[in-house]
Amino acid sequence: MKRALALIAILICLALPARAVSLRTVSAFGGTDASALAYVELLREYEAQSGNVVEDNSGTSDESWKASVLSDFAAGNEPDLLFFFACSADSAPILRKMVPLSEINAAYPDLALPESDILREADGNVYAIPLRPYFEGLFVNTDLFEQYGAPLPDTWEHLEAAVAIFREAGVVPISVSLSDIPHYLAECTVLAASSPEEYTSRPTALDEVPRSWHRGMELIHHLYTLGAFPENALNTSEAVTSELFRQKKAAMQIDGSWFVNSLPAQSMDTTVVMPMPSSDGESTAIIGGVSMGFYLTRRVWDDPSRRDAAVALLGWLTRPDHLKRLAAQEVTGALAESADAMAARTADMVRPIQDDMNKNARERWLLECVPAVAVGDMTADECWARVMALAPFGAQIAPPAAAALN
């Protein structure tokens, strides 16, 4: 209540006769994002109450969008408020241009912005207000499993059996694009082969890479040879493969929790999400955490004529009731039950490998290695040698063989 009153007071002050302030925002609430409309509505409500103007540039959170945001920061063209990835290799390059929440709270104590430890950066500061706790898992069209008598993929053996049944029936077993957004597949197969300790290790030299990471990449090749993926997996898009799943032309899809919002109402009781099964049957870990949050940039903070307006916008967007509007998932039935069960497993969650990789290494792993390993043009050993040559997790002394591949 105290925070809400403080925010109302700021908005009232801003609404007094004065020159309108112009603010620039960038977010991932673009394209087909399920929260895009709610985000735009919140911006318009802020404009109506404050008299200020918000110029928003939202996009879809793919690799090109990430690169565009990072390029703008590098060029000194950062926005005033940003909704972006948090506590990851993606956020590291921009932190020096962000304002720690502790600094904002010190100047606006009644606003009491939440400082979540889960998003505490290496320097000890929290810069982002979190939204969208997430998980990654295996989405399953249970009606297709019933129709074809396939076992649910709750073990690796059942997964392979289901792949064989659906391939024989002419149904795509696992809908994925190996050329567009392959990171869910890569992360989940490495996890399937790893213990939580192995998965969460961050090697700084090639000989430190867990053997389970090699086995995880080999699982991609194994699934490819089993015919688990679409025939055009090497040259199709994620939009196309996701539509195959939604239209019940594919039995499974590995994806993030945000995928639930794109599923049609008629699938609420015929689609569930479950953990990717472990290849050795031992690990119960799942990939998850908090992926994104709202930031305030130093550019607007250091501008006395616009600081109050920007802080008010940050407070407005991150009010608890407004965060619920942005995080709303319109799902019901079996899908909602399974998604809630996955989201509740916070003790089992491990952070994605790619979140801690630098951009060049991440792109080499996901966009070069994954398709090449899948078809057999590159071995898992060659893959990790090429990735580690780019020091994905920080400084290293690369072995000559790895360095030569750079």
Predicted segments — roles?
Residues 18-90, 280-282, 382, 393-406:
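Conserved N-terminal structural module of periplasmic/extracytoplasmic solute-binding proteins
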Residues 72, 80, 108-143, 172-173, ...:
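A structural signal for short loop-to-beta-strand junctions that line the ligand-binding cleft
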Residues 21, 44, 48-49, 147-148, ...:
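Extracytoplasmic/periplasmic substrate-recognition and gating elements
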